[in-house]
Amino acid sequence: MIEIKMNIRWNVILGVIALCALAWFYSLNQETADLSELVKKPDSPDYVGYKMETTVFSPDGKKQYLALSDKIEHYTVNEQTLFTAPLVYLYPTTSNEKEKEKNANQNVDFFSTQSWKLSANQARLTKDQILYLEGNVVAQNLTSDSRLQRIETESAVVNLKTQDITSETQVKIKGKNFSSTGLKLVGNLRQQVATLKEQVKTYYEVSKQ
């Protein structure tokens, strides 16, 4: 009887030890899992923001562009920022004397007046301020009596420093009393210049007297 009781006691003790070991092993795995969640994955962004608004200034202190987005993701490793549903407002960085004089008469600061609005489904901004726009890309001129009023395409690249714009997809542009389509685009938003290439078609609006 004594031997049987000793065996039972040892079995209980060993069972308790086994349970403690299992509990310790489980808690160790949980801590490891928690720590792995804290470690940033190589392909994950360093910063994520929602409903963001950012104003960027030129070296001489003038507004260069205003960017709004439903979501942004910034990656430090390649110094790129991804935008979801971006809106980018461009400002004039050199003075057009005619427009400057007109705004002065209306007590409007020329360099604080937004000149173009860019929109797209997605966008990617590089460290050199090159903006890659993808999906339902629209460049809308916000100034009055502009020669070039609107650009529509599916993909475009805009240099935010120089306001050069290019596209390798089908493009439609609308200007004062005309509209044109083509397969490629080279232009400059600041200068209101857009040159279409390949299969270009232009339609003129005849004003009614």
Swiss-Prot record:
**Primary location recorded for the protein, binned into one broad class:** membrane
Q: Which GO terms describe its biological process?
A: Gram-negative-bacterium-type cell outer membrane assembly; lipopolysaccharide transport
> Per the UniProt record, which residue ranges are transmembrane?
7-26
List, alphabetically, the InterPro entries matched: LipoPS_assembly_LptC-rel, LPS_export_LptC, LptC
Q: Which domain of life is it from?
A: Bacteria
Keyword check for Transmembrane, yes or no: yes
Cellular compartments annotated: Cell inner membrane
Q: Which UniProt keywords apply?
A: Cell inner membrane, Cell membrane, Membrane, Transmembrane, Transmembrane helix
| GO molecular function annotations of the record | glycolipid transfer activity; lipopolysaccharide transmembrane transporter activity
Gene Ontology CC entries for this record: outer membrane-bounded periplasmic space; plasma membrane
Q: Topology with regard to the membrane?
A: Single-pass membrane protein
Reply yes or no: does the keyword S-adenosyl-L-methionine apply: no
Role this protein plays: Involved in the assembly of lipopolysaccharide (LPS). Required for the translocation of LPS from the inner membrane to the outer membrane. Facilitates the transfer of LPS from the inner membrane to the periplasmic protein LptA. Could be a docking site for LptA.
Could you say which protein family the record assigns here? Answer: Belongs to the LptC family.
What is said about its interaction partners and assembly?
Component of the lipopolysaccharide transport and assembly complex. Interacts with LptA and the LptBFG transporter complex.
Show the NCBIfam families listed in the entry: LptC_YrbK
The protein, known as: Lipopolysaccharide export system protein LptC
Which species is listed as the source?
A: Haemophilus influenzae (strain ATCC 51907 / DSM 11121 / KW20 / Rd)
Q: What is the lineage of its organism?
A: Bacteria, Pseudomonadati, Pseudomonadota, Gammaproteobacteria, Pasteurellales
